[in-house]
Design a protein with these regions (language model features):
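Catalytic cores of soluble, metal-dependent hydrolases
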Residues: 1-95
Length: 95
């Protein structure tokens, strides 16, 4: 996530409320095949978790998680991954 550190620092300096959207199609299809818009060469699950933890340092006032298409992943791995992302987001924001 190029530029994330600088963006978080700037938003923190301004002390503005932040709405945080996570589009799960940023994940590599090897990790998250259940999306209508797969991103070859996307980020890993651990990279996304690190980004969530970084952004959660801000004044998060709301959030959403998008782009899960469970019918495109009969294995259920994408749904499990999405649930883990939501859990980590809630834990990070509730700190």
């Amino acid at each position: 996530f190029e530029g994330l550190e600088e963006t978080v620092q700037e938003l923190d300096r301004k002390q503005v409320p932040v709405y945080f959207t996570i589009d799960l199609d940023c994940l590599d299809p090897s990790v998250f095949p259940g999306t209508g818009t797969p991103e070859a060469g996307g980020v890993s699950f651990l990279e996304l978790l690190a980004a969530i933890r970084k952004v959660s340092e801000l004044n998060i006032v709301g959030a959403d998680v998008n782009e899960l298409a469970p019918m495109l992943d009969p294995s259920g791995v994408s749904t499990a991954t999405a649930c883990k992302v939501v859990r980590e987001l809630l834990l990070a924001v509730a700190k």
